[in-house]
Amino acid sequence: MKIAIVGGGIFGIMSAIKLAKEHDVFLFEKNDDILKAASNVNQCRIHRGYHYPRSDETTIQTSKSHDSFLEEFSESIISGIDNYYCISKFDSYTKSKEYVKFCKRHNLEFTKVNLDLIDKNSIDICLKVKEYLFDHEILKKKCWEKLDKSGVTVYLNTIADYEIYEKYDFIIISTYANVNSLLKKYPEKQRDYQFEIVEKIFLELPLEFKNKSVVIMDGHFLSIDPVGAKNYFIIGDVVNTVHSRNIGKFPKIDAKFIPLLDKGLIKNPPFTNLNLFLKSGSRFFPKFNEAKYIGSSFCVKTVLPEVDSTDARLTLVEMIDKKIITIFSGKISTCIDAANQVEKLIKARK
């Protein structure tokens, strides 16, 4: 069969590679390269579930998928990184005792430690955990190698339109923030999503931070992660990352953001929440104000609506009609499991 996959993020890529074993597969990507949108504005964490104490379903899904991602992309794993999860002493949705019970319940390994770079008065507990980060550039390189080897035809700088419904036997829509864009003929199948214009900032941090990934839990806090082989960090902040949000079928994007979206690291952007990031981080890291600003990245982040109470980040694979499948991507480690689900749905229709 001829199969079109719309969206050159990791979920579209892995589905393309999987299906190309038995079909002619064509991958459409609107940008000039793969992995340029939300895949690129990412903490690059291969989640095992530590991040989601309020969503057992997300923890189970990511934990189940973790090992297959490690095996598929072992060369992209960054070695020598120590990973820590800390529970804030104030305003955390999950208390430290509850978090320890959560980790034990899901067989998530941890060791209680003291971490000198954190203000001890700001956290209740610090756990060193078994989790990994990946190098985005190496991941992209490996994805291109796998696409080339599998024989997938890739169209860059190409926006798929409704003509693909006539030209292909199956269409897989894996466009994340734009998942509803090719479902206008199926309004009853369009979901509401929460769309967020987000900024991640990049900082050079003092030597004490080297080779350390730290997540402050569980609420309106932040995480810091090394970026590949670079000497700087990507910072995510639950509150200050978000410039605007809306719930609906499509994102509402202020014109000032359009030139910044999906452009990778931008030095000296025309606006930034940098000072808010620094203020937030300084509550936990005394030396955070010694940081040197490198730049910011912007994209549209998409989550299911009304999940603030659980922070759930589920991956959903759905059959829209006899020839259309949608993938709504959750955490990156679930991309292989999603590809397997897509393959099963197609085989069931043959």
Feature names for model-found ranges:
Residues 2-26:
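N-terminal Rossmann-like FAD-binding beta1-loop-alpha1 element of flavoenzymes
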Residues 21-41:
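Glycine-rich FAD pyrophosphate-binding loop
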Residues 35, 170-217, 227-233, 255-256, ...:
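Central helical "cap/lid" subdomain
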Residues 43-118, 122-125, 261, 265:
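Dinucleotide-binding Rossmann-like beta1-alpha1 core, especially the glycine-rich loop
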Residues 77-87, 111-150, 321-329:
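Helix-loop-beta segment of a Rossmann-like dinucleotide-binding subdomain
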Residues 127-165, 170-183, 335-343:
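Helical element adjacent to the flavin cofactor pocket in flavoenzyme catalytic cores
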Residues 230, 242-299:
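Flavin-binding catalytic cores
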Residues 276-350:
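C-terminal catalytic lobe of FAD-dependent flavoproteins
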